């Protein structure tokens, strides 16, 4: 009898232990579910908050440049009149008769006035104040180069170029300079007008425009020093007209912090450049393009920079100014660390007259950049580009927009019309886009 009681008690104890274990397991599972539900609730609440904060942080540290409306006659000016015009660009802006009449009346009134020495001094003082204000945003960009002489002795050389402060976020101060200033280096020394020297890095280069963007991180150590740093606002180069006053700052004489004044003599629209077109301005003064010469309007806004891209053509000279309005999308991407995709062609929209004669609508290719993606894909001068990926191409604007949506390293399908013996034939090629 005692043995039966022992067996009963032993079994009962096992059942009680099993119940306790099951109860503990149930509590643990319930706690796990509660924790999971709590974590999910916290995630649902905090994720949107964190995402919002991340977006706000990104917005605070990104740069947005307001786009300028085109001149209005851009599409008609862009059309190809003949294959020879695809290189030079033929659009020339002439003032309307009414505006010209008003300008002549103003000029006549100015000529009839007798200016005193006091008037001249006052005008000179106004120009000087404007130049001094703009010069505060000019910096000297220097990078050291290590070399060796014939006896293998270490030599250090440096060259100075002009940079221009154009934007400031919570985390960095951004400058424009020339690609010559950052050749062979990713780090440069920036010297401010007040004498401070700081290290900056090359954010991006653009070989097509010879432009580079520098980034100087804003830290606790330099925040106070950079708090009042002047930056030059972007202007609208489309508004420039012949006879307008221009300020040349940076290094127009080949020396940093030099300045020149001049007047705009001529405007040429839709000049063919790689993968697009630009507006070129011809002033009555020269500047040093490689060293960095930045061009401001009378309001002290950046409207362009001196370029030597057209120095070998008859249509332009070494004093040409590249207008900023056509290039604002590219500059904005550079300042935000985004490289512009490169196809590597020069061309112009096929005009109405040519279409009536049987040429397909699209962009007539006048030249292909050697070793560019277009060259590697087999594109040739005389081809007419009609599509890039899913984008229909009829104008250079269409090509620019399609490349804006593309990225370096992306493979795109290009549809071309190539002139055969009797008619244009459709050809498809694939190009891997490079960076500019």
Whereabouts are the PLM-identified features?
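Active-site substrate-binding loop(s) of clan PA
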Residues: 201-203, 221-255, 284-286, 322, ...
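Active-site region of chymotrypsin-like
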Residues: 219-231, 259-320, 349-367
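A conserved glycine-rich beta-strand in the N-terminal activation segment of trypsin-fold
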Residues: 121-129, 145-178, 197-199, 231-233, ...
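PDZ/PDZ-like groove recognition
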Residues: 155, 335-402, 410, 415-436
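C-terminal cap/linker of serine protease catalytic domains
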Residues: 39-41, 298, 302-358, 423-424, ...
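N-terminal targeting leaders that route proteins to membranes or the secretory/organellar pathways
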Residues: 1-150, 187, 222-223, 302
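Active-site-proximal beta-strands of protease catalytic cores
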Residues: 43-44, 173-178, 239-252, 284, ...
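Catalytic-histidine neighborhood of serine endopeptidases
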Residues: 48-56, 168-210, 216-219, 228
């Amino acid at each position: 009898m005692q043995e039966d009681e022992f067996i009963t008690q032993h079994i009962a104890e096992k059942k009680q232990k099993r119940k306790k274990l099951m109860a503990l397991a149930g509590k643990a599972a319930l706690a796990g579910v509660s924790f999971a539900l709590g974590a999910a609730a916290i995630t649902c609440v905090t994720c949107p908050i964190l995402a919002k904060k991340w977006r706000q942080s990104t917005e605070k540290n990104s740069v947005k440049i307001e786009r300028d409306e085109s001149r209005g006659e851009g599409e008609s000016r862009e059309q190809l009149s003949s294959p020879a015009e695809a290189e030079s660009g033929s659009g020339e802006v002439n003032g309307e008769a009414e505006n010209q009449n008003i300008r002549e009346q103003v000029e006549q009134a100015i000529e009839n006035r007798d200016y005193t020495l006091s008037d001249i001094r006052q005008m000179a003082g106004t120009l000087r104040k404007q130049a001094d204000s703009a010069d505060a945003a000019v910096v000297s960009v220097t990078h050291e180069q290590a070399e060796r002489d014939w006896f293998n002795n270490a030599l250090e050389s440096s060259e100075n170029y002009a940079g221009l402060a154009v934007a400031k976020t919570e985390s960095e101060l951004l400058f424009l300079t020339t690609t010559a200033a950052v050749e062979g280096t990713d780090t440069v020394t920036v010297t401010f007008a007040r004498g401070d020297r700081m290290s900056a890095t090359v954010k991006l280069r653009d070989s097509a425009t010879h432009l580079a963007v520098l980034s100087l991180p804003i830290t606790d150590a330099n925040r106070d020093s950079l708090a009042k740093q002047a930056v030059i606002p972007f202007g609208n180069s489309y508004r420039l007209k012949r006879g307008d006053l221009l300020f040349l700052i940076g290094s127009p004489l080949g020396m940093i912090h030099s300045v020149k004044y001049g007047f705009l003599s001529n405007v040429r629209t839709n000049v063919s450049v790689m993968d697009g077109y630009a507006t070129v301005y011809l002033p009555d003064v020269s500047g040093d393009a490689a060293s960095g010469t930045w061009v401001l309007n009378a309001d002290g806004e950046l409207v362009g920079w001196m370029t030597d891209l057209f120095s070998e053509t008859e249509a332009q000279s070494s004093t040409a100014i590249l207008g900023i309005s056509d290039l604002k999308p590219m500059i904005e991407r550079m300042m935000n660390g985004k490289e512009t995709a490169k196809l590597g062609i020069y061309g112009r929209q096929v005009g109405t007259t040519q279409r009536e004669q049987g040429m397909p609508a699209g962009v007539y290719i006048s030249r292909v950049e050697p070793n560019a993606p277009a060259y590697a894909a087999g594109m040739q001068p005389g081809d007419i580009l009609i599509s890039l990926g899913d984008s229909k191409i009829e104008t250079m604007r269409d090509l620019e927009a399609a490349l804006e949506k593309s990225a370096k390293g992306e493979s795109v399908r290009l549809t071309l019309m190539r002139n055969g013996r009797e008619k244009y034939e459709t050809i498809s090629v694939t190009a891997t886009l490079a960076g500019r």
